[in-house]
Amino acid sequence: MTGGTIRERVVESAIAITVQDGWSSVTMARIAEAVGVSRQTVYNEIGSKPDLAQAVVLDELARVLAVVQSAFEAHPRDLRAGVRTAVRGVLEYGADDALVHAIVAGTHGADTDLLPLLTTSSEPLLEVAVEVVAARLAAYRPGSRDVRRVADLVVRVVLSHLMNPAASPARTASDLAWAVDRLLPT
């Protein structure tokens, strides 16, 4: 594996192993071999396996938030369309992404070590996502001071639908966009 910093290569390797064999197959020795460095170098770059898990999830979050940013940029004057496009994009991304499937599989009895980073220990992830969504919502200058609350609601609902979809991405996106439009009149 070549290209990128050692840290980036370590995270990419952990993702590849997780997708192929599950999180329980990820070891620092296996990553070191894939990256072409010593196991100690992996520990120096990342820390412990829980630190690596957080790095993997935050890397995936960055990809998801790029979808969110792009969706809002495509609709700079239409809050409802921006929310609808962002939510649909994230849900479709999650439905197609092998790492998201590997993480969410923990809800169905498979490897569960990554799942707490989306559920019971999700505060770091949620904080980052809520900040990005709140900033995007605030750009529409809604007539409400509850932008952060609404952003938190949106992030938590989308996360819930990533783990256990109740409807199609299009339907969920439309419903959530309708709700945001009511909660944040522009």
Name the predicted role of every residue range.
Residues G3, V147-V155, T172-L176:
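Short amphipathic alpha-helix in the helical subdomain of ABC transporter nucleotide-binding domains
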Residues D51, A55, V68-D96, A151:
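Hydrophobic alpha-helical connector segments
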Residues R88-E92, T119, V130, P185:
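Intrinsic, short, N-terminal disordered tails of RNA polymerase sigma-factor systems
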Residues E92-D96, A135-A139, D152-R171, R182-T186:
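Amphipathic C-terminal alpha-helical segment
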